[in-house]
Amino acid sequence: MSFFAVACSAPRSSMLLTGLNSSFSDMHRSPLFVFPVTISSRSVKRFAAVSSDSVLDPESKNQTRSRRKNKEAVTPIAETENNEKFPTKVPRKSKRGRRSEADAVEDYVRSSLERTFSTIKEQNPEVFENKEKANFIKDRGVDEEEEEEEEMVVEEEDPDWPVDTDVGWGIKASEYFDTHPIKNVVGDDGSEIDWEGEIDDSWVKEINCLEWESFAFHPSPLVVLVFERYKRASDNWKTLKELEKAIKVYWDAKDRLPPRAVKIDLNIETDLAYALKAKECPQILFLRGNRILYREKDFRTADELVHMIAHFYYKAKRPSCVDKANVTPYC
């Protein structure tokens, strides 16, 4: 059963307290904890009451305040004494670090030279008599080469000034190449192979990989020559000239759209040649759109190339030189 028990006056026998005595509460101003407990009929437990809001002594508060004031009064005096004895800032240490390698090498050379001179003096003291000690380490401020260059300066208005001295020993570049001209390679048939002159005026334009998209991805006919300038130059030159003759035939006809013709140097445009799977030179590729219709690796004359172009682009009869098995049909 539940009872309200007051800890300070709980009897041993079971009893029920419904309230607190008014006189008792007046005598003891401090509130008491009252809580329910279960007490058996045989024994009643004693409980201790503890006040949560105990009244503090006002004198103790005054004592703590006075102690705080005394501490505050003492601390500035102690700080001033410490400031007088010790500096406010810790002085910085001198910078320490590795010396540069150049300084270390210079010190090592100097010390080794001094040791060498001292040993020489001990062995033969007459060596350094009436002679100043040579400075073997070159001074950075003095440069003998600059002094020599300053002495060699010649005025621009000198009448003896040689012509085109920047090119050579007073020889003009034009005079040199007049006496020693650059000769082009001569082919097997006696024709001169002029790759540089062919760039300026040619029926077959040379392109690079950046220009490839504008030429390849177009529905009009395209003939591509993959060649090498300096390897099998005679064969590459002859194939180029035969292709130029065949292209010129269609340009002169004027009754239909002539095919476009470009050439690619295998040694320069390596990535483009790899993409086209062109490993041997010379070879001619017949393209339409983005597809290679046929790959010709053998040498063909201009007449044979005219028939091949007519077959692939203008629906003409297939010539005998075209292998049907290697032709890729255009859809």
Swiss-Prot record:
Cellular localisation: Plastid, Chloroplast; Plastid, Chloroplast stroma, Chloroplast nucleoid; Nucleus
GO BP field: chloroplast organization; regulation of DNA-templated transcription; response to temperature stimulus
Keyword field: Chloroplast, Nucleus, Plastid, Transit peptide
Tissues with expression: Expressed in leaves, shoots, stems, cauline leaves, flower buds, flowers and siliques.
Positions of the UniProt region annotated as Disordered: 52-105, 141-160
Domain of life: Eukaryota
UniProt keyword annotation of Chloroplast present: yes
Transit peptide location: 1-59
Reported consequences of knocking out the gene: Seedling lethality due to deficiency in chloroplast development. In the rcb-10 mutant, impeded PIF4 accumulation leading to lost warm-temperatures responses (e.g. 27 degrees Celsius).
UniProt keyword Plastid, yes or no: yes
Upregulation: Induced by light.
GO cellular component terms, semicolon-separated: chloroplast nucleoid; nucleus
Biased composition (Acidic residues): 142-160
InterPro entries: MRL7/MRL7L (IPR044701), Thioredoxin-like_sf (IPR036249)
Quaternary assembly: Component of the transcriptionally active chromosome (TAC) complexes. Interacts with FSD2 and PRDA1. Interacts with FSD3 and CITRX/TRXZ. Binds to PTAC12/HMR/PAP5.
Known function: Plays an essential role in early steps of chloroplast development. Involved in the regulation of plastid gene expression. May positively regulate plastid-encoded RNA polymerase (PEP) activity through binding to FSD3 and CITRX/TRXZ. Involved in redox-mediated regulation of chloroplast development. Possesses disulfide reductase activity in vitro. Required for the proper function of the plastid transcriptional machinery and protein accumulation in thylakoid membranes. May function as molecular chaperone to ensure proper organization of the nucleoids in chloroplasts.
PANTHER family: THIOREDOXIN-LIKE FOLD DOMAIN-CONTAINING PROTEIN MRL7, CHLOROPLASTIC, THIOREDOXIN-LIKE FOLD DOMAIN-CONTAINING PROTEIN MRL7L, CHLOROPLASTIC
UniProt protein name: Thioredoxin-like fold domain-containing protein MRL7, chloroplastic
Name of the encoding gene: MRL7
